[in-house]
Curated annotation (Swiss-Prot):
Pfam families recorded: DHO_dh
Record's cofactor remark: Binds 1 FMN per subunit.
Superkingdom to which the source organism belongs: Bacteria
Protein's job: Catalyzes the conversion of dihydroorotate to orotate with quinone as electron acceptor.
Membrane topology: Peripheral membrane protein
Naturally occurring in which organism (per UniProt): Thermus thermophilus (strain ATCC 27634 / DSM 579 / HB8)
Cellular component, GO annotation: cytoplasm; plasma membrane
Protein name as it appears in the record: Dihydroorotate dehydrogenase (quinone)
EC number: 1.3.5.2
Active-site positions on this chain: S178 (nucleophile)
Catalysed transformations (reactions): (S)-dihydroorotate + a quinone = orotate + a quinol
PROSITE patterns for the chain: DHODEHASE_1 (PS00911)
Pathway assigned to this chain's UniProt record: Pyrimidine metabolism; UMP biosynthesis via de novo pathway; orotate from (S)-dihydroorotate (quinone route): step 1/1
């Protein structure tokens, strides 16, 4: 099946796979047997972050299941949490196609999707239904603004989406760092970000996090850290996709959009280590270029409380979460580490 999907157009393959996973998710009893085979349940993997309990530190990054259609499947496949979105207050179709490209030679993707989603209201209905069914998977909700909303009114979009979705998420992420919505990254800059966080922080008692770009300078990252602390955010998600294109081999390398996957690995780890130096009181969620158990181990050791995957999962297939978590346990045993909290304190 994995090989068949790679023979299709990338967005068509994503739509087909997600549709099948959504059908599977709607049939709860059918999730139990594969979950017993695929999930790695071990108390050494448990994580407490921003007041939420996670069965393991490996999560599905935003973008894979924008509209919260396949939540049961992510649990059955072994993830410790899933982040839905990016969700905007109103539905939008996103950018023109083609807008998703596989860079197989680089184990990477380029996307310029443009926050295509069915809107916060429909996602809220799906999330409510999953909660009513007793889904045991912690869910993050990634929020954005509609493309046609001026930057000066961006906070209103984030507030509208947050109010619709607030009862159903375990934590919320403000996406101000996608390169595929014109002008959005300006919201990472001091005055815009200060105003945005001042509006959003009082609107929820749930954990609120900020997703940052990999292309920020150390000085800009320090400014983000300072504002996150000023407004009492619970954490940062680092990093989003990059505009950089150094060293790529694929013929798709010059396509516009955000690059994810293996080429982002070094920069994602560099940003994580920089943030960890000044992140007192903030939980860090690392994402970008995670492909192996050693990658997962390195992110946790560098200060991440949680780690997300997207492109690695696309290339690695349905057994990918299990392989990473079993490999992480082997590394913990080899190093004499009995819990992830102990690893981060090392």
């Amino acid at each position: 099946m994995h090989r068949f999907l790679f023979a299709l157009d990338p967005e068509a393959a994503h739509g087909l796979a997600l549709g099948l996973l959504a059908l599977w998710s709607e049939r709860g009893p059918l999730l139990e047997v594969p979950a017993r085979l695929l999930r790695v349940e071990d108390p050494r993997l448990r994580v407490e972050a921003f007041g939420v309990s996670f069965p393991n530190p490996l999560g599905l990054a935003a973008g894979m299941d924008k509209d919260a259609r396949a939540l049961g499947a992510w649990w059955a496949l072994g993830f410790g949490f899933a982040e839905v979105g990016t969700l905007t207050p109103r539905p939008q179709v996103g950018n023109p196609k083609p807008r998703l490209f596989r860079l197989v030679e680089d184990r990477a993707l380029i996307n310029r999707m443009g926050f295509n989603n069915r809107g916060a209201e429909e996602a809220a209905r799906r999330l409510k239904r999953s909660r009513q069914r007793g889904l045991p998977l912690p869910i993050g909700v990634n929020l954005g603004k509609n493309r046609d909303t001026p930057l000066g009114r961006a906070a209103e979009d984030y507030l509208k989406a947050l109010r619709l979705l607030e009862p159903f998420g375990d934590y919320f992420v403000l996406n101000v760092s996608s390169p595929n919505t014109p002008g959005l990254r300006a919201l990472q800059e001091g005055p815009f970000l200060d105003e945005l966080l001042a509006r959003l922080r009082p609107a929820t008692k749930k954990p609120l996090l900020l997703k940052v770009a990999p292309d920020l300078s150390p000085k800009a990252l320090d400014e983000v850290l300072a504002l996150a602390k000023k407004h009492r955010l619970q954490g940062l998600v680092a990093v989003n996709t990059t505009l950089a294109r150094e060293g790529l081999k694929s013929p798709w390398a010059k396509e516009a959009g955000g690059l994810s996957g293996r080429p982002l690995k070094g920069r994602a780890l560099e940003v994580l280590r920089h943030l960890a130096e000044g992140a007192e009181g903030l939980a860090l969620v690392s994402v970008g270029g995670v492909e192996t158990p050693l990658d997962l181990w390195e992110r946790l050791k560098a200060g991440a409380s949680l780690v997300q995957v997207y492109t690695g999962f696309v290339y690695g297939g349905p057994l990918f979460p299990r392989r990473l978590l079993l490999g992480l346990l082997r590394l913990m045993e080899a190093e004499g580490v009995s819990s992830l909290g102990e690893l981060r304190r090392a």
